[in-house]
């Protein structure tokens, strides 16, 4: 049976939970679209996160890798379009590291684009009644670090799709951040199942607008 690798992060930035791991862990050992889903937690640490991710890819030989992260303040499930080759941390990671304007891969390309059918994934989520959109930036913290590192690793591995999805706060987190949007864990789980099915089945992305004016 083919394998799908899906990752989430440990809590960071003073939060007690990270919605990415809270939801991703629920998918561990699930069978979706004929594939076994394996969930792995990544440390919210520059460098170490990619060490754990790369080891999992090497051990599992997945056909699809989805990295999931928290984006507090976003209202939608946001499927990332691109990762850039820069670490520029507004806050320290979980080991106190705070790189500023450092490349993720020395002499690497400026950016890597997701190899997922990002617009088809967003469309399928919306059809299921789940708020979703394409995101034009994964930030410059550990999420972008992981997305760039993932796509850089997959560049020489044939027939493996990969990319990154940001998810909102859970309601219990938003309660501590008055006015912040949130999404229930079960809704996010449904969205990630849709993302997996769509990514596995759609080879050519749909041609619909997903851009932004700013």
UniProtKB/Swiss-Prot annotation:
UniProt keyword annotation of Oxidoreductase present: no
Subcellular location: Cytoplasm
Cellular component aspect of the GO annotation: cytosol
Classification via Pfam families: Peptidase_C15 (PF01470)
GO biological process, one term: proteolysis
Domain of life: Bacteria
GO MF: pyroglutamyl-peptidase activity
Catalytic site positions: 80, 143, 166
Enzyme Commission number: 3.4.19.3
Keywords assigned by UniProt, alphabetized: Cytoplasm, Hydrolase, Protease, Thiol protease
Catalytic activity reported: Release of an N-terminal pyroglutamyl group from a polypeptide, the second amino acid generally not being Pro
CDD domains: Peptidase_C15
Membrane spanning residue stretches: none
Keyword Metal-binding applies: no
PANTHER family: PROTEASE FAMILY C15 PYROGLUTAMYL-PEPTIDASE I-RELATED, PYROGLUTAMYL-PEPTIDASE I
Function: Removes 5-oxoproline from various penultimate amino acid residues except L-proline.
Family: Belongs to the peptidase C15 family.
Quaternary structure and interacting proteins, as annotated: Homotetramer.
Record protein name field: Pyrrolidone-carboxylate peptidase
Annotated source species: Citrobacter koseri (strain ATCC BAA-895 / CDC 4225-83 / SGSC4696)
Taxonomy of the source species: Bacteria, Pseudomonadati, Pseudomonadota, Gammaproteobacteria, Enterobacterales
